[in-house]
A protein has these predicted regions:
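Extended, charge-enriched "interface" segments that sit outside catalytic cores
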Residues: 1-107
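Internal helix-loop-helix
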Residues: 76-167, 213-215
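Glycine- and acidic
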Residues: 102-103, 116-126, 136-140, 178, ...
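Internal maturation/activation junctions in enzymes
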Residues: 146-194, 198-202
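A short core secondary-structure module
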Residues: 203, 207-247
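A glycine-rich, basic-preceded beta-loop-alpha segment at the flavin cofactor/substrate interface
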Residues: 242-244, 266-294, 311-316
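Flexible, small-/acidic-enriched active-site or ligand-binding loops
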Residues: 244-270
Length: 316
């Protein structure tokens, strides 16, 4: 085929850089007690700017998740299929300690170093930062129920990413999600109608819906439901201890303008099994501990997006 024109005045692809090559970021980390983690941050930043990771980001964004409500034989499965690049990004984020590892790292500046890593890594691909952030944020809320925290916190903090649908306590590492919003209860979750009925074994049966739940393939979720005492926080696993799927039905995925690599689902619960977290009737106070942490990560993610955009513009 003959050449019709010569490509000129086009910037080469932006790759082979470090998102941690940021004087203000590193100065702040050193100043506030996280200097011991600088080498880890630099290594992660170099990986975030590598051709390999930028290709993962491109593929994850170009191939949005797909919902499979049933398998080929007609069995209900409620699974979301992600591009392999999504799982590669998730594994790298978890292995580098951006999830709940900071809670187990008994060292001054652990949360600062984790925040710097999250900021540097989010410049590669922001969508998968959602479940990473929620896993980090779940820990302080879960600590309102010490027995559950003792069982689940080590797995939330483990540097192992395992996407297989198995009982949470049979896995080596967990991802956590959060479900609050209902059709009539977004900003005001007190209007939520999803009901929680006590069972004889201390668990509760959840019936109702959630209108917007991101990362629906998480292993466990902190949710709000109306118990007899009022709005209460619960821990709801995707897979029950006996290996059966919990009764949470993924109705459809949201068609989103941005954040397309990450799935956000509409969910219905048909007597799904969950365990109470914190004081009954004080669910908002309990789950707000998780909300606050995710909002801090929203700031980090937004700053990362602005930094990535600036870098791209300057390169061009």
């Amino acid at each position: 085929m003959s050449t019709t024109h010569e490509v000129q005045n086009q910037a080469p692809p932006l790759t082979g850089f470090s998102t941690a090559d940021d004087a203000a970021l590193l100065e702040a980390v050193r100043r506030d007690g996280g200097g011991w983690g600088e080498d880890e941050i630099r290594a992660l930043g170099a990986r975030a700017g590598s051709a390999e990771v930028r290709d993962w980001a491109r593929m994850a964004e170009a191939s949005p998740p797909v919902l499979h409500t049933h398998d080929r034989y007609g069995h209900r499965v409620d699974e979301v299929e992600f591009h392999p690049a999504w799982h590669q990004l998730m594994a790298a984020a978890v292995e580098s300690g951006q999830h709940a590892a900071a809670w187990a790292r008994d060292r001054p500046g652990a949360h600062l170093v984790r925040a710097a890593k999250f900021y540097a890594w989010a410049q590669a691909e922001p969508g998968h930062g959602c479940p990473v952030s929620m896993t980090y944020a779940a820990v302080p809320a879960l600590r309102a129920q010490p027995d559950l925290a003792a069982a689940y916190e080590p797995l939330l903090a483990a540097a192992v990413y395992d996407s297989a649908p198995r009982p949470p306590l049979a896995k080596r590492g967990l991802i956590a999600g959060m479900s609050m919003t209902e059709k009539q209860g977004g900003s005001d979750v007190r209007a939520n109608t999803t009901a929680a009925v006590p069972a004889v074994d201390g668990s509760y049966l959840i019936t109702g819906h959630k209108w917007f739940t991101s990362a629906p393939m998480s292993d466990v979720f902190l949710i709000l439901a109306q118990a007899p005492e009022g709005l209460t926080c619960f821990l709801l696993p995707r897979v029950l201890p006996d290996g059966t799927r919990n009764a949470m039905r993924l109705m459809r995925l949201k068609d989103k303008l941005g954040n397309r690599s990450n799935a956000s689902a509409e969910i219905e619960y048909e007597q799904a099994v969950a365990w109470p977290v914190g004081e009954p009737g004080r669910g908002v106070r309990t789950i707000v501990e998780m909300v606050n942490m995710t909002r801090l990560d929203c700031v980090l993610g937004s700053a990362a997006g602005m930094r990535a955009g600036l870098r791209q513009a300057l390169h061009h």
